[in-house]
Amino acid sequence: MQVVLGEAPCPLCILQRYALLLIAVFAFIGAAMRNKGAITLFEGLVVLSALGGVAAAGHHVYTQFFPEVSCGVDVLQPIVDGLPLAKVFPLVFQVDGFCSTPYPPVLGLSLAQWALVAFVLTVILVPLGIYRNRQRKA
C-alpha cells in the first residue's frame, strides 16, 4: 500500500513492521527447534514481540483518534531511521510520514487498527495454542 497508494509510513508503522518481522523470525526459528526448552523460549519471544506490536499499534490508533496529542513532529523518526534495517532496506523501514495522518480505511478499519487486531490475536492465540499442545502431549 505504501508504494501503490502513496501512503507514507510513520515511526509507529515502522515499529509495527519490526514487531511483525520479529514474530516471523522467532516463529520460524522456534518451529525448527527440537529441544522443548528452546521451543518455549522462542514461543515466549513471539509473544513478547506481539506485545511490543500491541504497544506500537495501540499508541498509533490513539494518535489517529486524538491527533491533537501529536505535536506534528515525530520524535521517534531519528531513532527509527537510525536502526540498521532502515539503512539496508530504506523502502520498507525508513520513516516518511506522520503518525496522525489519516488514510482511507480498509474494510472499515485503519491499517493501525488492523495491526492492533493481529497483534492482540497473536498475544491471545499463541499461548492458547501452546497450552493446548502441551495438554495433548501430557
Where are these regions (language model features)?
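Membrane-embedded alpha-helical transmembrane segments of multi-pass integral membrane proteins
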Residues: 23-26, 49-59, 121-125
